[in-house]
Amino acid sequence: MTPHFDYSEVPYSFGLCAAENCPKASTCLRRIAMQYAPVNRIFLPTMNPNRIIAGKGKCDYYCSNEKTRFALGFTRTANALTVRMASTFRYRMISYFGRKNYYLKRRGALKITPAEQIYVINVAKELGVVLNDYFDGYIEEYNWNA
């Protein structure tokens, strides 16, 4: 079992897996979460066992238990932009994230995924911003959306 696994971090609708004999069970976040499910949760969102059997060892729903490095906030990048480029950067970020998520991600209220980090860095570089670090902070967590 994974040490220091906190089931309270598991999203409510995150699909769990009951396949004990799966070759990837020891590193699958879905299986690990199932092992740590609290007794007071009577019904759990669980993958259909027949689907697992039909897959013959291949699982399309495998979710690695490796933690992912998420970025928090990119005000550092936004502040490094010239006045002329700031609006272009903002418009491109809003078209990518959406207006609400742009402001939440900019200030660090929403995590920025690795793919989103690459996009932010590429746009900043296109606009002439070169920094050692483009984000305000980082956090390592399980990627429940993988």
Predicted ranges, named:
Residues 8-12, 69, 85, 97, ...:
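Alpha-helix N-cap/N′ positions at the starts of helices
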Residues 115-133:
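DNA major-groove recognition helix of helix-turn-helix/homeodomain DNA-binding modules
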Residues 98-112:
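Recognition helix of helix-turn-helix/homeodomain-like DNA-binding domains
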Residues 127-146:
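Short C-terminal boundary/hinge segments that cap the last helix of small helical domains
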Residues 1-62:
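N-terminal cysteine/histidine-rich coordination modules
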Residues 63-88, 130-134:
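A short, Lys/Arg-rich alpha-helix, primarily the initiator
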Residues 85-95, 102:
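Short alpha-helical "recognition helix" segments of helix-turn-helix
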Residues 76-78, 101, 117:
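Catalytic cores of transferase enzymes with a strong primary signal for eukaryotic protein kinases
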